[in-house]
Regions:
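Basic, low-complexity intrinsically disordered segments
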Residues: 2-34, 39
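Acidic, Ala/Val/Gly-enriched low-complexity intrinsically disordered segments
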Residues: 9, 25, 40, 56-60, ...
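Aromatic (phenylalanine/tyrosine) cluster motif
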Residues: 23, 27, 49-52, 64, ...
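Periodic, rod-like helical contexts
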Residues: 28-29, 43-47
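Targeting/processing segments of secretory and organellar proteins
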Residues: 32-33, 49, 56
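Fe-S-dependent hydro-lyases/dehydratases of central metabolism
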Residues: 70-587
C-alpha cells in the first residue's frame, strides 16, 4: 500500500466519518493478522483492526492511530519455551511485556497475570483493545481502578441442568442455518465445551446395598429424552463432549480429568482458563487454573468466542503460615477461611493464597478451600502453580510430556512456584496461621456461622429457642413436646420405608448425607468419615431408623479409598451405602 491509497483526510490527521462497513472493502489487506504495509511508519494514521487502534475525536468521528502494542507484539508473540517433547513452543511472553514499558508487571498477583495473558493473546483491536491490555498491565494494588476486562477463556464447563438449554440454543441456530439453505455445521462452539451429567441423580433409595443401581435406573427413566439429546449433541458438535451420568460431580471431574494446566492451539501455548455454569466452579482454582461460575448467557457467549467481561477486581492476599494440627481437616480450614473472609469482605474480589503454609497444603485440601469461594463471597479462591500441582497431574494420569510442558511454560512466564511474603502486591493482605484452625462446623443457616465442634450441642439448643429476628428458629425448647407439620403434637409420625414409627420434634435429625463437591473427593476427608464409622460400629453405636443415610462420592475413585482400607463394611453397617455419584442431597 502506498501513500496515494490513503485518504487525504487521514494523511492530514483529520477525523474520518464512521463508515466501518466500507473499511475492509477499501483496505482489504488491513485485517487481523495481516502484514505490516510499508507505509505504516510514515503514515500518521491507517485504518485496520488489531495492528491499529481507534480513539474518539471531539466532533464524534474517529481518528485512527498506530496501535502502540504492535511495536512489541512480534517479540512477545514469537517467544518460545521448550515443551515436554523437546521441541520449541510459542507463547505470548509476559516477561517480554514487562521489559517493554511495564516494569512492575512481575509484582502483579498471579491470577491477574494469567488474565492479562489472555488479553494480550486475544488483542485484536475490537473485542480486546490495546487499552484493555495497558489497563491491566498497569494494575495498581492500591487503586485498581474501575473498568471492564474482556476475558477470553480457553474452555467452558457445564453441568446438565444449565447445560441442556445452551445445547438447545445451538441446535436451534443449526436449524435456522439449515432453513436458509446453508451448511448447518458452521454453527460450532469456538472453544472446547465439556458437560458433566451430575445434577439429575436423586436419592430415591438409600440404606440398602443395591441403592446405587436402583437410583441409576430411575435416573435414566426420568431423563431418557434429555440424555438422548445430550448424546446427539456430542455426536453433532466437534468441540462438545459429555461426561455420562454416575461418573462424578462436575467440579471433581474437572479437577481429576478435564484440567490440562496448559493448552495449545496452532502451535501457541497458553494457560488453561475457564468459566462454568455452577458457582463452585472455583474448585479448579486449587490447581492454579483461573475460572469461576457464570450465568448461562455468559457461558453461551464464551462458547461462541466472545469475552466474559467483569470489572477489574481488587485482589486480597491470604498469607498462610504454619500447618494444620493433627485431627484438623480441610473442611475445618475451609470453614475458618469462610468466617475470616466473610468478616473482611471479599465480594467481587479475587482471593489469592500464598506463603509457606499454602505451599505445604496437599492439592486436595487447596481444592476444598477454593471450592468454598462462593460461600466466602469471592470471585475466586486461587492457589498459584507449584510442584504440588505437578504431582497431582501425575497422580491423575497426565503424561510426563504434558507435565513437563506445564512446568516449563509457567517457568518461562515467571509464574511458577508459590509466592512468599513480600513477593507480590495485593490490595489487602490477611494473615492465617494454620495451626490456629480448630475442628468446627457451620450453620445451621449460613456457612459463615462458625461453631466449634465441642460447642455444637449447646449452640444448636440455643438456636432452636432464639428469636427468628436474631437468627434462631423461635421454638420453645421442650423435650416433652413432639411436633410435626402434618400431625397433632405428640402423635407419632410414621416414617415410610421402616417397620417402626418415630417421634419427631424440633431439632430431630432426619438426613445424614456424606456428600457435596467440597468434601467427597478429598482423600483425607473421606478416610476420616470411614474411620469415624468404624469407631462407631466398634462402640456399638447405630443410626435411628428415621434418619435417611447416604453417601455420594464426588468421583468413583473415592469409593476405592473405602474398599482399599476396609472401611466400606463399617459404613454399610450404619446405612451409608453409596447411592450415586453426583450432587444428590445438596440440590
Amino acid at each position: 500500500m502506498t501513500h496515494s491509497m490513503i485518504p487525504a483526510a487521514c494523511m492530514e490527521k483529520r477525523c474520518l466519518k464512521k463508515r466501518q462497513p466500507r473499511f475492509r472493502e477499501k483496505f482489504p489487506r488491513l485485517r487481523k493478522g495481516g502484514k505490516n504495509p510499508p507505509s505504516v511508519t510514515q503514515s500518521p494514521c491507517l485504518i485496520t483492526f488489531g495492528l491499529y487502534s481507534t480513539r474518539d475525536c471531539q466532533e464524534g468521528s474517529r481518528l485512527f492511530t498506530v496501535n502502540p502494542l504492535f511495536r512489541i507484539m512480534t517479540k512477545i508473540a514469537k517467544s518460545t519455551f521448550t515443551t515436554g517433547t523437546g521441541t520449541p513452543g510459542q507463547f505470548y511472553s509476559l516477561p517480554a511485556l514487562a521489559e517493554n514499558g511495564y516494569p512492575r508487571l512481575n509484582r502483579l498477583p498471579v491470577s491477574i497475570r494469567i488474565v492479562l495473558e489472555s488479553l494480550l493473546r486475544n488483542c485484536d483491536g475490537l473485542k480486546v483493545t490495546e487499552k484493555d491490555v495497558d489497563n491491566l498491565a498497569s494494575w495498581n494494588a492500591n487503586n485498581p481502578g474501575s473498568y471492564e476486562i474482556p476475558f477470553t477463556v480457553a474452555r467452558i464447563v457445564l453441568q446438565d441442568l444449565t447445560g441442556v438449554p445452551l445445547l438447545v440454543d445451538l441446535a436451534a441456530m443449526r436449524s435456522a442455518v439449515a432453513g436458509l439453505g446453508k451448511d448447518a455445521s458452521v454453527i460450532e462452539p469456538l472453544v472446547p465445551v465439556d458437560l458433566v451429567v451430575d445434577h439429575s441423580v436423586q436419592v430415591d433409595w438409600a440404606g440398602c446395598t443395591d441403592a446405587l443401581e436402583k437410583n441409576l435406573d430411575i435416573e435414566f427413566q426420568r431423563n431418557a429424552e434429555r440424555y438422548e439429546f445430550l448424546k446427539w449433541g456430542q455426536q453433532a458438535f466437534q468441540t462438545f463432549s459429555v461426561v455420562p451420568p454416575s461418573v462424578g460431580i462436575v467440579h471433581q471431574v474437572n479437577l481429576e480429568y478435564l484440567a490440562q494446566g496448559v493448552m495449545e492451539k496452532d502451535g501457541v501455548y497458553f494457560p488453561d482458563t475457564l468459566v462454568g455454569t455452577d458457582s463452585h466452579t472455583t474448585m479448579i482454582n486449587g490447581i492454579g487454573v483461573v475460572g469461576w461460575g457464570v450465568g448461562g448467557i455468559e457461558a453461551e457467549a464464551g462458547m461462541l468466542g466472545q469475552p466474559v467481561t467483569f470489572l477489574v477486581p481488587e485482589v486480597v492476599g491470604v498469607h498462610m503460615t504454619g500447618e494444620l494440627r493433627e485431627g484438623v481437616t480441610a473442611t475445618d480450614l475451609a470453614l475458618h477461611v469462610t468466617q475470616m473472609l466473610r468478616s473482611h469482605g471479599v465480594v467481587g474480589k479475587f482471593v489469592e493464597f500464598f506463603g509457606d503454609g499454602a505451599a505445604a497444603l496437599p492439592l486436595a485440601d487447596r481444592a476444598t478451600v477454593a471450592n468454598m469461594a462462593p460461600e466466602y463471597g469471592a470471585t475466586m479462591g486461587f492457589f498459584p502453580m507449584d510442584e504440588r500441582c505437578s504431582d497431582y497431574l501425575r497422580q491423575t494420569g497426565r503424561s510426563e510430556e504434558a507435565i513437563t510442558t506445564y512446568e516449563n511454560y509457567f517457568k518461562a512466564q515467571n509464574l511458577w512456584g508459590m509466592p512468599r511474603n513480600g513477593d507480590l502486591d495485593y490490595t489487602d493482605q490477611l494473615e492465617l496461621d494454620l495451626s490456629a484452625v480448630e475442628p468446627a462446623v457451620s450453620g445451621p443457616r449460613r456457612p459463615q456461622d462458625h461453631i466449634r465442634l465441642n460447642s455444637i450441642r449447646d449452640s444448636f439448643r440455643k438456636l432452636v429457642s432464639m428469636p427468628v429476628a436474631e437468627g434462631g428458629y423461635g421454638k420453645k425448647e421442650s423435650p416433652e413436646v413432639t411436633v410435626s407439620m402434618h400431625s397433632p403434637a405428640g402423635v407419632p409420625v410414621p416414617v415410610d420405608g421402616f417397620s417402626q414409627e418415630a417421634k419427631l420434634k424440633d431439632g430431630s435429625i432426619l438426613i445424614a448425607a456424606i456428600t457435596s463437591c467440597t468434601n467427597t473427593s478429598n482423600p483425607g476427608l473421606m478416610l476420616a468419615a470411614g474411620l469415624l464409622a468404624k469407631k462407631a460400629v466398634e462402640r456399638g453405636l447405630n443410626v435411628p431408623p428415621h434418619v435417611k443415610t447416604s453417601i455420594a462420592p464426588g468421583s468413583r475413585i473415592a469409593s476405592d479409598y473405602f474398599a482399599t482400607n476396609s472401611l466400606q463394611e463399617s459404613l454399610d453397617a450404619l446405612g451409608f451405602e453409596t447411592v450415586g455419584y453426583g450432587c444428590t442431597t445438596c440440590i
